[in-house]
């Protein structure tokens, strides 16, 4: 789960961790930007004090029961690899399980960061139209990264499909030209697991409310 900047200070971070755990999350990432934050691939990002961020990481580590805590740093753009590595080490000391160096711009930067963080689980962000070149999962693995996210890819594909749909609707007055690009009703129901919900619904016993006032009848 993307925990943004933790939604506040240490106590807010602790609350966030418990809420995410109760919702079933297995991991959360927290970043070191200041509000109002920006996409990691934009310019003029403002960073939190490294020790303030470390305090948030420590709060997350203290509050969690099992949640995996990933500390993200956006420092490479303004403080270089040296700054990003220094922050990452501080966050690890505070209790982070893994490090996410955001918006590295070359394979050399990815390799150098990994070289200077031996044995540390690292996460890479592969977002299209950003500052990071295209790399595959296996290429990231070869550079020393155990985890990769594609956080906006499905949204971009879905938005493009919606643009095409509404353009066709405006042009044709109907959706007939787009039917072959849609899920069928059967495919949709399979995707959302409708049969499982129907079975669950059928298995629930109807509630039977007591009639009258049985306590009063027994006392009589």
Where is each model-derived feature located?
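Alpha/beta enzyme core
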Residues: 1-150, 156-167, 197, 204-218
